[in-house]
Amino acid sequence: PLNSLPMSLNFQPSVVTSNEGGTGIGYSKMTVRGSKGSQINVTLNGITLNDAESQEVFWVNIPALGNILSSVQLQRGLGTSASGAGAFGASINMSTASVKAEPSGWVDISRGAWNTMTTSAGLSTGLLRHGFYADFVYSKNSTDGYIRNAYGDVQSALAVLGWMGEKNSLRLTYIMGNQHTGITWGGISKSQLEKDRRYNSAGEYYDSFGNVHYYDNETDNYTQHHLQLNYAHQFNQAWTWTTTLNYTKGDGFYDQYKAGKKLTKYGLSSPVEIDGVSYKKGDFITLKSMDNSYYVINSDLRYSKNALKV
């Protein structure tokens, strides 16, 4: 499964990856030389993707990221970063900037186990008269998942409008990621793994007769938009100035069934008496939402001549 970027990097030395659903679609994680995701500095077109609070990168927010990239650079070990926190475990630098000389288009459709399907298409105008160009990429992927409730329906899109002059360039980039997946982050014990490898406790509850049921809307939903404006000017063969403006907007929610939880945890008085029976615990359906914005201005002046780079 080579859908998300961590899964695509799985064959690199010192890289270990995992996917919660077992198909490569949905939540994926990676370690480099044993360092977890919060210790890996990740940039996209020079803009840091690491979450400001957890320092993690939620790869599921931009599904099928590999389809919209022109280059990926993985640097293992301790390193510095000009656009974010320093990297303890590794640095991953990704770029969507690639101007094609000729018009082109492509379509890729694949199907796999557990009703997994990936569909991607791209179109490029190539470099037009007066230096203008445009690129478009769209991907839609779906799966039932290997473990229970690991279904996924995710989409991503890229649109680039740009201009290249003799010493100047201007590029506007829009990236969208849309996620609708089942909750799979609970994990299982070793004994459960030996009994049923596809077991997932998400949404599990029991009725008064002891029969097991599953809440049918145990979902995680998130949409993220990235808008980047990049300007570059080359003074001469040694000096280059680049400036990038970035705005990231994300919003979503997850719906989750909580069984046997204390009433006081949700601000309710305890105990509660119903039909003569006293209760201190109950079952809850929780919906937690997120709405965040991220602004960045990144400006670099670079000098490069012979073996010296500053």
Model-flagged regions — what are they?
Residues 11, 48-76, 94-95, 192:
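Short acidic/polar hinge/loop motifs at secondary-structure boundaries
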Residues 28, 88-90, 103-107, 117-121, ...:
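Hydrophobic, lipid-facing positions within transmembrane beta-strands of outer-membrane proteins
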Residues 37, 49, 97, 112-114, ...:
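Structural signature of outer-membrane beta-barrel domains
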Residues 54-55, 74-76, 103-106, 140-144, ...:
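Extracytoplasmic loops and strand-loop junctions of Gram-negative outer membrane beta-barrel proteins
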Residues 162, 169-232, 253-290:
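Acidic/polar loop-and-plug regions of large Gram-negative outer-membrane beta-barrel proteins
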